[in-house]
A protein has these predicted regions:
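Active-site recognition of the HExxH zinc-binding catalytic motif
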Residues: 67-80
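Metalloprotease/metallohydrolase-associated module, dominated by Zn2+-dependent proteases
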Residues: 2-42, 48-49, 57-63, 86-161
């Protein structure tokens, strides 16, 4: 089953996307991550394409949340580092590699949440990560990595609280 995430025209969002990309790249540099160039159009296409899992997070959700935009920039950057083109079918065509990029992005996102001391966000995303273990599309070889992320950030949350 595939689902297409909510669509808002590129023209309506391009300026906002550009501003948010700039802000996220600064945040990522502070976290020690050197992102690949991500154009506003690539970001838009990636965020509005179909997903095999029925993802319900929309481009608006991401633009409204600094943690999610950091996540998506890392995810797209990691895919580009693997030589994967970013377009409206990337997630469907390369979904096993997307999971690898997704986990790297999750680590940066949650490091940023720890840095910001946003423990509520950490709890939300740790719960999301638990559900990823039940995802039928998750490649089996990535289950240990998902568990390691859960362990690391659950322990980090306990230390901070």
């Amino acid at each position: 089953m595939t689902s297409s995430r909510t669509r808002v025209s590129y023209a309506a969002l391009s300026k906002r996307i550009n501003e948010k990309l700039r802000d996220a790249i600064k945040i990522l540099k502070e976290l020690g991550y050197e992102s690949q160039h991500v154009s506003p159009k690539e970001f838009y296409d990636y965020m509005t394409e179909e997903t095999p899992t029925g993802d319900t997070i929309t481009i608006i959700d991401v633009l409204d949340n600094d943690f999610l935009i950091v996540h998506e920039i890392v995810e797209i950057s990691e895919l580009k580092k693997m030589g994967i083109p970013i377009h409206r079918r990337t997630i469907i065509m390369f979904h096993p590699k997307v999971y690898e990029a997704h986990f790297t992005a999750t680590e940066y996102e949650l490091d940023y949440a720890l840095d910001k001391k946003d423990y509520d966000w950490l709890r939300v995303r740790i719960n999301h990560a638990k559900s990823w273990l039940e995802d039928d599309y998750l490649p089996k070889h990535l289950v240990p990595r998902c568990r390691a992320i859960l362990k690391r950030f659950s322990e980090g949350l306990l230390k901070e609280e």
